[in-house]
């Protein structure tokens, strides 16, 4: 299940295994694991969004990120991390990528607890809102049963 290179194993395991363990423990105790983990994902995502905003609001940082958005997205969701994706548009107007297969979702599914990773998706969606001058949208997610996660990023000088 955690096959592949050591970096990929560490990346997938560090994110998925704690979520699956919490999901199983909460379910065993009779708690609504999905709601609790999703609330945690939302809260942590908002917290990370604040950190992301502080960093990216430093003058020049958001422009630098946008000029290298393709490299940035490679580091966050590249094939070297186990994602399968399709680039649908490139800057300057928009950077769009469809994630067709997510290593987090695949590992959780193999472990029999695919709903455990919904909290990671929610955290991701919340913290990506923190980017200064970069507008982020995602309307679908593989973990929610969709064909893809539809990431769309646009540079927006008016977004604070």
Language-model segments: residues:
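C-terminal non-catalytic interaction appendages of large macromolecular assemblies
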Residues: 93-96, 103-160
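N-terminal leader/targeting and assembly helices and adjacent pre-domain segments
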Residues: 1-11, 15
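A general boundary/transition motif marking the beginning of the first structured unit of a protein
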Residues: 10, 60-61, 116
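Amphipathic interaction/junction segments at domain boundaries or subunit interfaces
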Residues: 14-20, 24-111
């Amino acid at each position: 299940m955690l096959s592949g290179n050591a970096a990929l194993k560490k990346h997938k395991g560090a994110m998925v295994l704690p979520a699956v363990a919490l999901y199983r423990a909460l379910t065993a105790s009779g708690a609504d694991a999905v709601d609790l983990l999703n609330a945690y994902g939302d809260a942590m995502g908002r917290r990370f969004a604040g950190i992301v905003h502080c960093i990216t609001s430093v003058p020049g940082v958001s422009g630098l990120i946008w000029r290298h958005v393709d490299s940035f997205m490679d580091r966050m969701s590249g094939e070297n991390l186990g994602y399968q994706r399709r680039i649908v548009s490139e800057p300057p107007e928009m950077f769009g990528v469809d994630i067709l297969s997510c290593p987090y979702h695949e590992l959780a599914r193999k472990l029999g607890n695919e709903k455990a990773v919904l909290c990671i998706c929610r955290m991701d969606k919340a913290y990506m809102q923190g980017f200064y001058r970069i507008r982020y949208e995602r309307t679908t997610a593989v973990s929610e049963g969709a064909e893809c996660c539809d990431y769309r990023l646009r540079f927006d000088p008016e977004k604070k």
